[in-house]
């Protein structure tokens, strides 16, 4: 795997979850953005892969599992087999990336998306690999019990624009948010 993409929505206190749900009320257009970004493959005949921890998987309503038109990989050291609906189970992010490099999947997968939770984001951001981070900043505070790890802004640079990502502030149901894209570029060793 040559590059990673992570996508997350955070509120102002860097919260990403509360009691297994999102800390804020449903934002339909923000969810559509997540669906569009993670589903759209740029290579004919290939699909994107989404990698997530077990809690993130079970936070998705059952009727929406697996995330459709994407190869769903769940990470867990405890589970013995992939949860119902998931395509693959891996013990760690490294195992999942090795799986994606296997002949079975290499020819089928375009982009690799990390969709949570905290530990999976942290492991991905620490890897010395090109990485784009798609952050929806919700411009309000909401009570949260799960948080996004600290972003190292020495590595991750905010892009001024990115194709397909609206630049202006969005608003739904009185909640304002904006889309940001950060990029970490690692020179080939």
From Swiss-Prot:
One of its GO terms (biological process) is one-carbon metabolic process. Substrate binds at residues 30-35, 64, 70. It catalyses: (6S)-5,6,7,8-tetrahydrofolate + NADP(+) = 7,8-dihydrofolate + NADPH + H(+). GO terms for cellular component: mitochondrion. Its EC number is 1.5.1.3. This is Dihydrofolate reductase. Key enzyme in folate metabolism. Contributes to the de novo mitochondrial thymidylate biosynthesis pathway. Catalyzes an essential reaction for de novo glycine and purine synthesis, and for DNA precursor synthesis. May bind to mRNA. Keywords: Methotrexate resistance, NADP, One-carbon metabolism, Oxidoreductase, RNA-binding. It comes from Gallus gallus. Residues 3-184 form the DHFR domain. GO terms for molecular function: dihydrofolate reductase activity; mRNA binding; NADP binding.
């Amino acid at each position: 795997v040559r590059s990673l993409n992570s996508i997350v929505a955070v509120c102002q206190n860097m919260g990403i979850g509360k009691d297994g749900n999102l800390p804020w009320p449903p934002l339909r257009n923000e969810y559509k953005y997540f669906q569009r970004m993670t589903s759209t493959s740029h290579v004919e005949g290939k699909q994107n892969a989404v990698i997530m921890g077990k809690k993130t998987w079970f936070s998705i309503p059952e009727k929406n599992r697996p995330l459709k038109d994407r190869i769903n990989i769940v990470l867990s050291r405890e589970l013995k087999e992939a949860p119902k609906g998931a395509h693959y189970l891996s013990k760690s992010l490294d195992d999942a990336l090795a799986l994606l490099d296997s002949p079975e999947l290499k020819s089928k997968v375009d982009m690799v998306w990390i969709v949570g939770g905290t530990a999976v984001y942290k492991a991905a951001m620490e890897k010395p690999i090109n990485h784009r981070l798609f952050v929806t900043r919700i411009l309000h505070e909401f009570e949260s019990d799960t948080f996004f790890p600290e972003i190292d802004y020495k590595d991750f640079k905010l892009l001024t624009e990115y194709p397909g990502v609206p630049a202006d502030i969005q608003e739904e149901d009185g909640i304002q948010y904006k889309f940001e894209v950060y990029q970490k570029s690692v020179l080939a060793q």
